[in-house]
């Protein structure tokens, strides 16, 4: 299909679309059947996103417009148009339940920021390029005032709606006072910074809700169920995920997410349950085992009788917990808000008294000018912006100023084990030859040959080990997967077995006393043993372990030295493994075999005891605890989307040492903010009464007012250059 053909289609009675523009990797398409239909907008986004080379796609149901950003080198534009045609015929019940991506962008907010930036730029050019006076002429002042009112409208509306002397009233008073005294530049600068902060905070919340919604619906829009009655009993049919009911027999194929909680009634499989337990190593399940929605069948096929569906599944409860925890988070009462509650009404009273007693309008204007809390409004956002920029350069992504404040106060930290205190991917620790004709290198080489086509993490670890040792992997003729046990391979005319001790027992391979002692020893050390047999004879053993991060012990020691009183390790692993890891790291408190609800309970319990709690994790199962903690920290942007979106801080480079930097930066940011408030409040408070006494002229008041703002910005800028130890 060419662009010309697409334009011809638009003239037909079929679902129409017109390519409005297509240049420089950006295509805009007008689709009439998307207009006023958010669900169809989602369909188009889903269809186009599957095309190779497409980077971002936004569908706007208000206008019927779709904007696609793509790579001109990698993307076939005809496939985009074909995807749109196909999206027109998707059944309504198969459309994912979510909002269009364009809902993350509110044009009016972007417009306010853009107009504010443009106005500040023009005022700067006027003052410093054309050397014009500070005071604006009438026409320019009217335009600037209009821009100020437009950019400050949300705050003005909030102050009028709630009628309280909070943040909105603080900003509104500053805006009105600045307009009266012709301080348009100050008003615009403050409003522009605050608009950016409000926009980013709102955007983060919307993205979090979208990530959580995607988690609940999963990647599966449909499920296969087996009919149990009627003339078609035994037939497997595909149905929308929303129509699956409790008691249905759900068929789950390889590499597909399990859509329901339930009991396995037929089949065997290796299942990755990391979305629930947080543990990367898959487990074997068979008839009688209980499985959870969100788990993925790595290998095999299962028949599951549904016991919970939708929001009532374990993964659904995780979503609910996250949403509740986010809503329960108490708002932090900043110094600026507390100051405004007292100072703003006081300034009005003092100015009114001054006017009543002196009848001097200029003195009253001086009081309002010196009382204008613009410097107080700048105290936090400038420091936070500098600190966040400093952290970003070091791979610390902080989502808001309140989280910086909490980072410096944390005195209890919870760690998820897998992927946080440990590396999160198993490595080979021992290779033992148990036959005189076999060397450890041969054992590893042929073991890798057996695992070469497997996607199991243990298999990947064995193969990585051969690459690290530069050992060639011999070919094999045929292989067979023994679900839950291991692999059977035929190579060089011999039969190779690699797997658990249970596999060798089932195949009647004799396991020597030495090998049994090795197995017991390794399990006690939290390592996984794989036995290797050739033609019915045990010839070697390989053990694997999820290694503790090399920096973990030192980081924990430094955290204790910095004032952290409680460190607790949480894991879904067996108690023996948890105990061994905790002992190695010197952790006295740990919880094993915990579910997401249990992690959340530990957070709540510590908070009830009076601790400021930090939670460090990287998985979906950590999300409720990350949201409920006073500060949630996601380890690595490679972690799950929900963990990263829910957390208050994300560590991009996956290094535990960054935890120390978060704490250090948070403490330093709080110090700077306090200094800013001290300076600005002192100037406002002293200036209020000095101005009322007539010791200041409006010009001096304006100079003092601007000087306090400059001092606050200069003090905050020190955070940009602050060096973390």
Curated annotation (Swiss-Prot):
Residues 25-92 form the HMA domain. Keywords: ATP-binding, Cell membrane, Magnesium, Manganese, Membrane, Metal-binding, Nucleotide-binding, Phosphoprotein, Translocase, Transmembrane, Transmembrane helix. SUPFAM superfamilies: Calcium ATPase, transduction domain A, Calcium ATPase, transmembrane domain M, HAD-like. Mg(2+) binds at residues 416, 418, 618. It is found in: Cell membrane. It is an enzyme of class 7 (translocase). It holds the Pfam family E1-E2_ATPase. The chain crosses the membrane at residues 101-119, 142-160, 165-179, 188-202, 335-359, 365-383, 669-688, 698-717. High affinity, slow turnover Mn(2+) transporting ATPase. This is Manganese-exporting P-type ATPase. It comes from Mycobacterium leprae (strain TN). The gene is ctpC.
